[in-house]
């Protein structure tokens, strides 16, 4: 007889009331600043120059994210953590829950590192 075990780790992020809320443009700017510090180290260590993660975000009736859950990783725990933390601080009017107290959407966060540039992208998926 063979017995197997499967375990799953769910990583989610909650907003911090002590930190500001961001729209998607401001969130991308914040991540760009972070990547400008991280990218030279990534490139020197021969780590991936680009990638993306996907998160499921839950918003309230104001469009503020109340929870961001990592569903697809970049493969880098530090980047995933930063993307999750910033996603949890989003507040976007077009993401307001209207029919119920909360709404759930998918968010794609990408990054690209080059010797002289670092870019983050955020896209709320339909």
Task: Describe each region flagged by the PLM.
Residues 72-78:
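A short acidic/small-residue loop/turn micro-motif
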């Amino acid at each position: 007889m063979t017995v197997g075990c499967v375990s799953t780790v769910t990583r989610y992020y909650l907003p911090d009331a002590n930190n500001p809320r961001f729209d998607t443009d401001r969130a991308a700017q914040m991540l760009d600043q972070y990547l400008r510090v991280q990218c030279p180290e990534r490139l020197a260590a021969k780590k991936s120059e680009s990638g993306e993660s996907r998160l499921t975000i839950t918003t309230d009736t104001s469009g503020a994210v109340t929870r961001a859950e990592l569903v697809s990783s970049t493969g880098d725990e530090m980047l995933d953590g930063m993307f999750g933390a910033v996603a949890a601080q989003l507040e976007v009017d077009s993401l307001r829950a209207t029919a119920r107290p909360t709404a759930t959407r998918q968010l794609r966060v990408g990054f690209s590192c080059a010797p002289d540039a670092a870019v983050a992208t955020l896209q709320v998926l339909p």
